[in-house]
Amino acid sequence: KMIGEVTSKQIAISVPTARSFSRTFTLPIATEKALHDAVVLEADQYIPIPSTSLYIDHQVIERTKQEITVLMSAVPRVVIDNIVTTVEAAGFQPILIEPSISSVGRVLTATEEGSLPTVIVDIGPASTDIAILDRGTIRVTGGLAIGGNTFTLDIAKKLNVALENAHQLKVLNG
């Protein structure tokens, strides 16, 4: 059941962090002219999927006289294409697509001063997303194929209680 009314056809979409790749890396300042090529080279070295099968984006997040620090994000084309097809079929226009942990990071950076490094751990039902923010920018992301459901099952087994009771214990006691 929907609460309220959707008044805009433009939407932002988050992709599961487990389906995306994000990484920061440093390059000599002279490389900035060929930044796109350097980012693709980094993707080829770091990501186990050919760069031709990825949508890759990047942002310079830090600059000194000698070097630049770049944040690269990449998602398999098939993942993005399927999402866009579904969203457009529903009558919406995607204007932003980003890893879900990046969305959480942006919210935290907007609400915090960002002066201390921060670790974000987003525990979902089936997976856990992790990001490290430093100076208001995501530096590293990762994910685990373990989420809240795993914890609930473990509690149920260890305490020999029903899943519903295990879930309540997890929520109430952490």
Label every PLM stretch briefly.
Residues 1, 10-16, 66, 109-141, ...:
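Gly/Thr-rich phosphate-binding beta-strand-loop-beta motif of the actin/hexokinase/Hsp70
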Residues 1-10, 90, 161:
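Phosphate/pyrophosphate-binding loops at sites that engage ATP/ADP/AMP, CoA/4′-phosphopantetheine
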Residues 10-112:
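Active-site neighborhood for divalent-cation/phosphate handling
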Residues 78-104, 137-174:
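Glycine-rich phosphate-binding loop plus the immediately following alpha-helix
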